[in-house]
């Protein structure tokens, strides 16, 4: 609620202020009135769009449906994901322990998680001389635990930031919405799984998701 209130107030306050100013100037009809009006309207339009985008992202978080589980092969799941990143300048490496491993998942939701993680990893290492992302799977039979990790050789995440990245609407990207990793965490939680991150500044990050195989 605090985050929601803060974001809405940040958008509404300048809109109200500018509206008041434009009304006053319209009455006074001072110099450079046309430029002032245009600048004010542009700001109102931009902040209104920002507020609309925020509300839409909030809806995505609050309306995430319960997963519809169905058996999916790991190889099949990753095969479709691979196609989306074929044209990337980043070198994506896939180390799949068992392509025939079956998972009971909501395929659409899990694809959303993987796309988000691979996209973020690619962006994180894009500026490296040899940008590389490794996707690796493993299965711990005695505990029925399936793991999938996404590791990049990017710049890593700052220590004071790493604990906040799963918080809704928290982002360090200028154009980021801050909901991607929050959605990932929610989806994994709804699947009875988890997601964690380990990162070393200057060396890269590793996101690991864990699912119980039933």
Regions found by a protein language model. Give the residues of each.
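Histidine phosphotransfer helical core of two-component systems
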Residues: 12-49
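Short alpha-helical Gxxx[C/S/T] motif in the catalytic ATP-binding
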Residues: 180, 184
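Conserved catalytic submotifs in the C-terminal HATPase_c
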Residues: 91-102
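Conserved micro-motifs of the catalytic ATP-binding
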Residues: 64-67, 102-105, 172
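Short helix N-cap motif at coil->helix boundaries in the Bergerat
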Residues: 74, 156-164
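Conserved glycine-rich
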Residues: 192-193
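A conserved beta-strand-to-alpha-helix junction within the catalytic ATP-binding
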Residues: 68-82
């Amino acid at each position: 609620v605090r985050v929601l209130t803060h974001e809405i107030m940040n958008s509404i306050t300048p809109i109200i202020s500018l509206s008041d100013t434009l009304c006053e100037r319209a009455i006074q009809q001072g110099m450079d009135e046309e430029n002032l009006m245009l600048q004010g309207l542009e700001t109102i339009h931009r902040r209104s769009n920002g507020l609309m985008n925020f509300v839409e992202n909030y809806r995505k978080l609050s309306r995430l449906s319960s997963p519809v589980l169905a058996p999916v092969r790991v190889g099949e799941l990753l095969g479709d994901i691979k196609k989306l990143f074929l044209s990337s300048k980043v070198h994506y490496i896939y180390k799949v322990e068992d392509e025939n491993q079956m998972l009971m998942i909501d395929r659409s939701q899990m694809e959303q998680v993987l796309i988000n993680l691979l996209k973020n990893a690619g962006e994180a290492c894009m500026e490296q001389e040899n940008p590389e992302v490794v996707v690796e799977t493993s299965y711990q039979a005695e505990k029925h635990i399936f793991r999938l990790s996404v590791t990049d050789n990017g710049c890593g995440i700052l220590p004071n930031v790493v604990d906040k990245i799963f918080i809704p609407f928290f982002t360090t990207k200028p154009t980021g919405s801050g909901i991607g990793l929050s959605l990932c965490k929610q989806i994994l939680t709804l699947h009875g799984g988890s997601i964690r991150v380990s990162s070393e500044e200057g060396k890269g990050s590793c996101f690991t998701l864990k699912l119980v195989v039933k």
